[in-house]
Amino acid sequence: MRVDIEKMEVTVTVIVMLLSFAGGSNIGNISARSKNRGKGSMWWGIAKAGEPNNLSPLSPGVPYLDSSAYYGTLRRKQRRLARENPGLLDAIAKGAKMAIHECQFQFRNQRWNCSTRNFLRGKNLFGKIVDRGCRETAFIYAITSAAVTHAIARACSEGTIDTCNCDTHYKGRPQVFANGNNAAAVTNVRDFEWGGCSDNIGFGFDVSREFVDTGERGKSLREKINLHNNEAGRWHVQSQMRQECKCHGMSGSCTVKTCWMRLPPFRVIGDLLKDRFDGASHITTSNGGNGRNNNKGHSNRLPKHPKMNAIMSNSIHSKRENRRRLHKYNFQLKPFNPEHKPPGTKDLVYYEMSPGFCEKNPKLGIQGTHGRLCNDTSMGVEGCDIMCCGRGYRTQEIVVVERCNCTFHWCCEVKCDICRTRKTIHTCV
């Protein structure tokens, strides 16, 4: 009897060992995917697809952009959206580049300057700082989501996406005056007609949700934060739709006024998100898990003008997918300080403190502030005292060579002088 038991134990041990050898790699991959979920987005790499170091050699000395370079940064659902909406991927790539440019502009005078790397692996585009749930990561998610929304909405009105065009649902609606009153209560205000070509914010908002939020299930705390910050970026774009008008009439008169809705330059969105970054909401880590609460701070509403273009892909409109999509946004984040109100729809949220940016940290992709330019007369974040972290700074005089006194000569040439000026600069030691 004891021999049989020993044989059974040996058999079980061998089976377990075989299973571990056969499926160990898969188990490891699953755990790795679970660990890395919500930390960085591969699609960010689209912004670098056209960089020289990401081009393939067509022939010696003649590089070209392989079409697979774009698709290599995308998930299956994102590739499907790109196939079903020709022209969409170019708009998203433009949005990703806009996001990087705006992020670097907003933080140009701060210790963290939103530096990026020049390769296609999007998760590492901004460095490993996105592994932290800090304020800088919140801004990255919000600005990239906002830029994609802005770029898609504008691309629709420009006619560069085959499956969408101008937003025409304003036509036939009651006229809205700048002061919000009814026409009967307004004097000396000219009527207008809806016309022109409005930016399609409904399409941009919804497709941005489908594309940008792919892979974010909203189950863990980090995924909820990513979804919230992505939504915050989109709502900042949607809320900035503006009415533009053009007058028609003899001798500059405004006999007829035609109006349409248009998005502002993306700099306006960047400024708003930078303000939200400065006042970002610190949330508690007890927000994790699958609990769903009545959501008052985090809106499930679609855009103010949610009617989508009739020719948009049916896959985006499927009722089942719509219900599942809205369900993952149904949560309320709790503030770290119970006395503070919960974060609103447009607030940026974080749960980890930012790392130090004074010294170089290759692990997080932080460049440090050594060698950075600073302003010796400023008391702000760009001042040498703060930028250089108390290490001091060097002052040197350089000669700047630039074109000046440019004049236009008919036709068609611009001639400039070469000017040399001395300039004093300050760099952190």
Annotate each PLM feature:
Residues 2, 9, 20-386, 390-429:
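Long, position-biased, composition-driven segments near the start of the mature protein
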Residues 7-15:
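Sec-dependent signal peptide recognition
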